[in-house]
C-alpha cells in the first residue's frame, strides 16, 4: 500500500515534468521551425533580388517585341517602310540563295553596268544566317516573314546593354529605368518597327554594347597588376564588339570618340585637379592611369584583328581620323545652302538637324506624346527627357563639387551628350543616337530622386 501511495504521488510529478519538458521541446521545435522559415525566406529574397534584373529585362524585351509587332495583328499592315529596308532584304535574300555568300557583283545598282561590292555589311550576313538558324525549327518560314520579327528582336536586345550602362554608371535602378526609356523611346521605336529591317536596330545594339563593354572593362581595371586577366579579357571583348560594329556601319567611330575622349580628359583632369604641375607628379598620374592606357591598347589590337583582314592595312588610322572628316564631308555632299541642293538632302540622314532647341524638342517628340496621351503639353515639357538630362548633370556636378563623387560618370556622359548634340545639329540622323544619352541620364536622375525620397521617409 505504501508503495502504491508513493507511486501515486510520484505520477503527477512525473507528468508535470513530462509536460514541462514536452512544452519546452515543442517551443524549441517551433523556434527552430520559425528560424528555418526565416532563413528560407531570407534565402528566397536574396535569390529573387539576384534574379530580379534578369526577370525585369525579359519582361521589358517581351513588351518591346509586342509593341513593335502590334501593327501586324491588323489586316492592313505596312512592310519594308523605306528603301534601305528593301536593300537589306534583297542582300539577305541573295546570301540565302547563294549558299551563304553575297555575290560580289550587284546587277541592280548603277544599271546597266552594275556595282562591285567591296565590303558588304555584316548586318546582311547576320540577318541571312539568323534566318537559316530559325528555319531549322520552322522550315516553312520565308525570309519576308522572318524579317517581320528580326528588327523587333534586335531592338529589344538593346535593353541588355542599356541596363549594364545604367548599372555601372549609378545603380541597378538606373539600369532598369535606362532599359525602359531606351527601348520605348519614340525615336527608337519609329526606326525599329517589325517588318522594317533597316540597320538602325543593330547599329544601336552595337553602339550600346561597345559602350557597355568599355564601362565594364574600366570598372574592373586592376591598377596593381598591369597584366591581370581583367585588364586583357574585358578590353579584348570590347575591341571585338567595336570591330564587328565597324563591319556593320561606317559611323562606328562614335564609340572610339567617346572612349578616346574619356581617356584623354581623365588623364588631364587627374593631372590638373591636384594642382601640382611638375614632372614627378606627371609620372604619378601616368602610373595611376597606366592600366587604363594598357587596356585601351588591348582594345585596339582586338579591333584590328577583326577589321584589318577585311579593310586592309590602310584602315589602321581610321578610328582616329574618321571623326575629323565625317562632319565636314556630310556638309560638303549635301549642299543644302547652295542654289541646287543635291539628292542627299532628301535622305533623312543628311537633312540638317537645326539648332539645339530643335534637337531638344525633337528628341522627346513632346507634341506627339501630348496628343497621344492627352496629358497637357506643359506637363510633358516639365518631364521631358531634355530637362531630366539637365537635372542629371546638375546632380552629377553637385555630387562631384560637394563629395567628389561620380566624376567619371560626369565626364563620360558629358562627352557623350555634347558630341551627339553637336552631331545632331549637322544631320538629323544623329538625333537617334542622342536618344541613349537622354534615356540613361533621365534614368539616373529619377533613380537618385527615388533614393532621396525613400531616405526622407
Describe the residue ranges of each PLM region.
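Active-site lumenal/periplasmic loops and adjacent helix-entry segments of GT-C-fold
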Residues: 67-169, 173-181, 185-206
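Membrane-embedded helix bundles of polyisoprenyl
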Residues: 60-65, 136, 149-168, 173-222, ...
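Transmembrane signal-anchor helices characteristic of membrane glycosylation enzymes that use polyprenol
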Residues: 44-85, 90, 97, 103, ...
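Hydrophobic/aromatic-rich transmembrane helices and adjacent perimembrane loops
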Residues: 254, 419, 426-457
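Start-transfer (signal-anchor) and selected internal transmembrane alpha helices
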Residues: 1-72, 83, 176, 232, ...
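Alpha-helical transmembrane segments at the extracellular/periplasmic loop-to-helix junctions
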Residues: 328-399, 409
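Perimembrane helix-loop-helix junctions
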Residues: 219-226, 232, 242, 255-304, ...
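Membrane-interface helix-loop-helix junctions at transmembrane boundaries of multi-pass membrane enzymes
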Residues: 224-229, 274-292, 377-415, 452, ...
